């Protein structure tokens, strides 16, 4: 037998709900279990990584389970992210990933979040594609396929405001 353990999102999106039997059928699974906590919106509460892509950040110092081909690990994990300019200098740090932006935060939005950031106009957003800032907007930016959006408020807005269209940057989490 060639059995694998796979993770899946309800309806293949961050905000979704679906019966476990539906996910199992879509994934052609022989067994399935709901192994996550999630909000009423369907958003996972806690660390979620699928096929090497970070989908959501850790939540409230909860323990996370990591499964590899020959190893399973349970640990408390934290979140750390940085925005680095092309010259190697650090612009700022991230406060979160694929969740609503709060006061004085910088949040990274990927397509796993949806097609737009769904943020208000009190922030500043840099739309990034292939490592290059392609647009600067106030809020509710379209998240490009293969790219991401950095969304800032308050103090972080000032830092993100240093960017211009054409600037190159890298984000690490």
What are these model-predicted stretches?
Residues 1-173:
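Gly/Ser/Thr/Pro-rich low-complexity, intrinsically disordered segments
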